[in-house]
Amino acid sequence: MPRTRTPLAAIVLAAGKGTRMKSNKAKVLHEVAGRPLAYYPVKRALELGASPVVVVVGHQAEAVEAALSAALPEAPLRFAVQEQQLGTAHAVLAAKRALRGYRGPVLILSGDTPLLRAETLEAVVSARRRARAAVSLATMTLEAPRGYGRVVRDARGRPARIVEEKDATEAERAVREVNAGLYCVDAELLWKKLAKVGTANAQREFYLTDLVPMAAQAGGVAGVEVPVEEASGVNDRVELSRANRVMVGRLAEAFMRAGVTIEDPARFDCDEGVEIGADAVIEPNVRLRGRTRVGARTRVGAGAVITDGVLADGVTVNPYTVISEAQVAEGAILGPFSRLRPGADIGPEAHVGNFVEVKKSRLGKGAKANHLAYLGDAEIGAGANIGAGTITCNYDGERKNPTRIGEGAFIGSDSILVAPIEIGAGAYVAAGSTLTDPVPAGALALGRARQVTKEGWVAQRQAEKQMKGTATGPASARKGRPAARRAS
């Protein structure tokens, strides 16, 4: 990743409400690949070596600050508040105090551009340095530039000014080169020129673009054309969805080039920050969320959803398994249709089968719960076998209680283990038992009613029913009328 060799600060503009999102949440908090929109331009500036990075917040300022601080806890972030949203120049001025004493270039970028690459930022920064210009700015060429500020160049082909669409003439609106909202400018020049920006425009706002003609007079402006995909901002849900698809596609491509098989990248979904080891196989419609780590040679079946899960090497996750804040050791087999809730710890070569739910429990090496079970607050020893329908009754209405099952124990189908309870190593629990007391190692426990078998009961019952019907007779006979006869 490129890093600038000279001092560099950055300002990320993230104060707007984003009315076109039609949301109660600030626009920059909407997520792409599991991260807030503003996370990406901040992260790219950091990758370039910018320090500090000042984030200008406004609408829902506390929430934006909290989200970025949580996502980038070690980053040299500073926050500046734009109390009123009076335009982009006004927003940049809000960052002045946070950069007090800093001398050097300042990179200015928008908080709603998640697809920018660090290489693109480096191109804008280096263009100013190479051209010895006062300002460098990113531009892009659009087939339909509606809504964007047009870049007007001088006779020598250098950017001379940017005209917002509402202020543009017909000739200027025909220009297809537009402002991408990405600038690099010397800090001293920035504060000096912004003090002169006024509101003589259709929006009655302080435009950052007014800096361009001033810079053209002070040392020139260097223009850098950048890819449309990268510089296009996210303004509504449609654009958010497109940006998410592009970002996930980039992640998928990086995984595949690193040796991961993704069977259908178009039906793959993951968050930024997910890790996948070499020779892992990801089937269609898998979702990998949060800080999930998938080990080498692990196979994740179709429809699985994993959030903050840690899977070791060689794990098999069968289709439609749901994992959340759980860890799985090497060689374990999960699913299909199993669920690991927070605190589940599945040991090496253990099996958690279909419709088995595990919460805050550890299964030792080779332990098996293959069908229809609930295991909560349990410690299950190596090699233990949990039969279908087994339930650990861990909650007594006030607190959670533990269940301990020893190594090699065998729990019969449809058993109910009322916690707190301990089943010793090698013990057997008969099918259908409800247990409340400890079971010693090597013992057999039965906790069910004794079976009673009544031979001939069905025939006796049928005879009794027949006798009852004969004694009562048909309804017509009881009323003194002859019974109706059926034609033969």
UniProtKB/Swiss-Prot annotation:
Cofactor annotation: Mg(2+)
InterPro entries membership: Bifunctional_GlmU (IPR005882), GlmU-like (IPR050065), GlmU_C_LbH (IPR038009), Hexapep (IPR001451), Hexapep_transf_CS (IPR018357), MobA-like_NTP_Trfase (IPR025877), Nucleotide-diphossugar_trans (IPR029044), Trimer_LpxA-like_sf (IPR011004)
Sites binding Mg(2+) sit at: 112, 235
Q: Name one GO biological process term.
A: cell wall organization
- Residues of the region (Pyrophosphorylase) are 1-237
CDD domains for this protein: GT2_GlmU_N_bac, LbH_GlmU_C
Its Gene Ontology molecular function terms? glucosamine-1-phosphate N-acetyltransferase activity; magnesium ion binding; UDP-N-acetylglucosamine diphosphorylase activity
Linker: annotated segments: 238-258
Active-site residues annotated for this sequence: 371
Subcellular location(s): the record lists:
Cytoplasm
The record's listing under SUPFAM superfamilies reads: Nucleotide-diphospho-sugar transferases, Trimeric LpxA-like enzymes
**Residues bound to acetyl-CoA:** 388, 394-395, 413, 431, 448
What's the EC number here? 2.7.7.23, 2.3.1.157
Q: What is the top-level taxon of the source organism? A: Bacteria
Compositional bias segments (type: Basic residues): 478-488
Subunit structure as annotated in this protein's UniProt entry: Homotrimer.
- In UniProt terms, what function does this protein have? Catalyzes the last two sequential reactions in the de novo biosynthetic pathway for UDP-N-acetylglucosamine (UDP-GlcNAc). The C-terminal domain catalyzes the transfer of acetyl group from acetyl coenzyme A to glucosamine-1-phosphate (GlcN-1-P) to produce N-acetylglucosamine-1-phosphate (GlcNAc-1-P), which is converted into UDP-GlcNAc by the transfer of uridine 5-monophosphate (from uridine 5-triphosphate), a reaction catalyzed by the N-terminal domain.
The name this protein goes by in its record: Bifunctional protein GlmU
Organism of this sequence: Anaeromyxobacter sp. (strain K)
